[in-house]
């Protein structure tokens, strides 16, 4: 075995970026097939490959960090920069949706009846389910912070309790959002209002599901004693992502649900 004269982790060749890219292609192509031809086989295949890719890629990262000790302080620092850049790109992603919403709502066209919400659209009451969803997500932000501080203090029981509670709140949010979609009086095809509403809130809902999955992985790792009070970047990244999801929801609630109604 050769001596390593630097603190960085040189990864071995991995198939997971290729399978992940293949899954992304199948999912986007499958979405088109689902929308236009009512066929969901391709998107389901893409989701299956993506799930298998995530499972095995996470397994490899856990193996490299927890059991082989490759995640040195320098590597962890680079992972932090990577997560910050990723969240920045996500902020810009949602900026596009807010831009589309405000572009359409601040100067509604004649086709919309020169009013916002457009003629024939009955918006959702912002003080019913959306307000409950806001309270649920804000509460989950408190519980994930509780879990983080408990982990840093070495309080394992409270870390597990708080993390479990956060996952339950995230799942509850997803259920409420799904119920809201089924009960809405308009669809994604109902003018620019329906398009901006369902695309913006739908992508946020997808991010909540991704964040919940992230937290479930962290819970499983915590149960297996993978995290210590000083070495837990996987959990830290999940907490950052969850706070990002919280903040985006506040902007969505104030813009689309409250002001936009």
UniProtKB/Swiss-Prot annotation:
Catalytic activity, reaction form: 4 Fe(II)-[cytochrome c] + O2 + 8 H(+)(in) = 4 Fe(III)-[cytochrome c] + 2 H2O + 4 H(+)(out)
Mitochondrial intermembrane-facing ranges: 35-40, 106-128, 184-190, 257-261
Family, as annotated: Belongs to the cytochrome c oxidase subunit 3 family.
Top-level enzyme category: translocase
A single GO BP: mitochondrial electron transport, cytochrome c to oxygen
Record-listed E.C. numbers: 7.1.1.9
Top-level lineage group: Eukaryota
Matches recorded under InterPro entries: Cyt_c/ubiquinol_Oxase_su3, Cyt_c_oxase_su3_dom, Cyt_c_oxidase-like_su3, Cyt_c_oxidase_su3-like_sf, Cyt_c_oxidase_su3_a-hlx
Record's function text: Component of the cytochrome c oxidase, the last enzyme in the mitochondrial electron transport chain which drives oxidative phosphorylation. The respiratory chain contains 3 multisubunit complexes succinate dehydrogenase (complex II, CII), ubiquinol-cytochrome c oxidoreductase (cytochrome b-c1 complex, complex III, CIII) and cytochrome c oxidase (complex IV, CIV), that cooperate to transfer electrons derived from NADH and succinate to molecular oxygen, creating an electrochemical gradient over the inner membrane that drives transmembrane transport and the ATP synthase.
Bilayer disposition of the protein: Multi-pass membrane protein
Entry keyword annotation includes Transmembrane: yes
Mitochondrial matrix compartment spans: 1-15, 67-72, 153-155, 224-232
GO molecular function, one term: cytochrome-c oxidase activity
Subcellular location: Mitochondrion inner membrane
Entry's transmembrane regions: 16-34, 41-66, 73-105, 129-152, 156-183, 191-223, 233-256
Source organism of the structure: Pelomedusa subrufa (African side-necked turtle)
GO cellular component terms listed in the entry, alphabetical order: mitochondrial inner membrane; respiratory chain complex IV
Subunit-structure text: Component of the cytochrome c oxidase (complex IV, CIV), a multisubunit enzyme composed of 14 subunits. The complex is composed of a catalytic core of 3 subunits MT-CO1, MT-CO2 and MT-CO3, encoded in the mitochondrial DNA, and 11 supernumerary subunits COX4I, COX5A, COX5B, COX6A, COX6B, COX6C, COX7A, COX7B, COX7C, COX8 and NDUFA4, which are encoded in the nuclear genome.
Keywords: Membrane, Mitochondrion, Mitochondrion inner membrane, Translocase, Transmembrane, Transmembrane helix
Keyword Cytoplasm included in the entry's annotation: no
GN (gene name): MT-CO3
The protein's name in its UniProt record: Cytochrome c oxidase subunit 3
